[in-house]
Amino acid sequence: MTLVTIKKDTQIAAIHAGIKIGSIYESEKEKGISHFIEHMLFKGTKYRDNETLNRELENLGGEYNAYTDSNSTVCSITVLEEELEKSIEILGDMFQNCLFPQEEIEREREVILSEIRGSKDDLEDYSFKKVNETAFDKSPLKYDTLGNEKIVKSFTRDKFIKFYERYYVPNNCFISIVSDFPHNYVVSIVEKYFKDWLWKEFKREKVLEEKNRFLKKVSYKNNVEQSTVVYLFTLHGLSKKEELALTILSHRLGESGNSVLFRELREKRGFAYDVYTDLDLSPYVKTLYIYTSVGRENVDETLDVINNCIESIKKGSIGFDSNTINLMKKILKTAIAFTLEDVTDIGNYAFHQIIDEENIFQFYEDMKDLDGIKEEDIYNVANKVLNKPTIHILLNQ
């Protein structure tokens, strides 16, 4: 088990406990199983039935949550510091003693099937799924974390138990805890409730890193008021410095109300309410998206605007002078400072750093390295990354 504790002057304790297993490690016949098991963690253990478990979580008086992403399944609890030990004990029970009652499996299967169907009604979410499906041939990024209806319907209790017993082992568990308690005290509590968990060898599926396809695809959907346009770029193999430069570029391109795309598509032309970039630098993911939603009559001009903005940045026509770069640095440093102030945010940050085998003090390095980013670094990474996108356009049927 990997445990990191962060001592902070606070009355709140934030615990993030997770298993390094998510959608990118699932085989084709397992798509959605990590997410399904995340749901089942709350459905009863050897020592607590569903009702008891959820009542005790509620009685902690704080907030609890769970999520599954590309490479992890995570449970988080934020409570008053006096509830730290009880929270750790409950999480220990969930991670070691989940029972998968058949009646709860069937009930939760319907919930997840409803979640999958409902996601198709979310135009934004649906558009991202379609561009991922279009962009990749074999990469796990083409599959949704929820899975699909056919596979979710096929999962058996035996399959859940085998997957749970294979990956829910201490040597695949990562925990971050933020509180006012000293490190040794927190370690003693974790050891108390996880000491009997048996170490076991396991092997994750090898993850394929794949460059996106260079193509444009148009899909159609019934009862759609707006059309969506999504660009996807993959960015494997960048250095840390290039990733920092790309972070500044992404912010300037589409992450603020003064970004290039926002001003061109919304302020100047009134085409879109939503327009933004989304940068994901997670291991094995490494993607940059551009998303907007416009009227069908404006799709062609929107494509021209996005393409022109990209080319203008690559050619240096859209400048990154010292004032612009310094502002971007200030914004990124402010975001880091906000994270450090919030116990839940810093706990989540530390959790993902350790699960990705990164330095938990990387933000200090990033803040220092930001000062070394120059205009040419941004243009260089723009010319390296902003080429041959996958473009998906969704129109009304």
Question: What residue ranges belong to the model's regions?
Answer:
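Short, Gly/Pro- and small/polar-rich lid/capping loops
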Residues: 1
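His/Glu-based metal-binding/catalytic segments typifying zinc-dependent metallopeptidases
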Residues: 4-18, 201-260, 394
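Active/ligand-binding-proximal structured segments within catalytic/core domains
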Residues: 7-57, 131, 231, 241-253, ...
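Charge-rich, well-structured scaffold segments of protease-associated domains
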Residues: 52-202, 219, 236-237, 254, ...
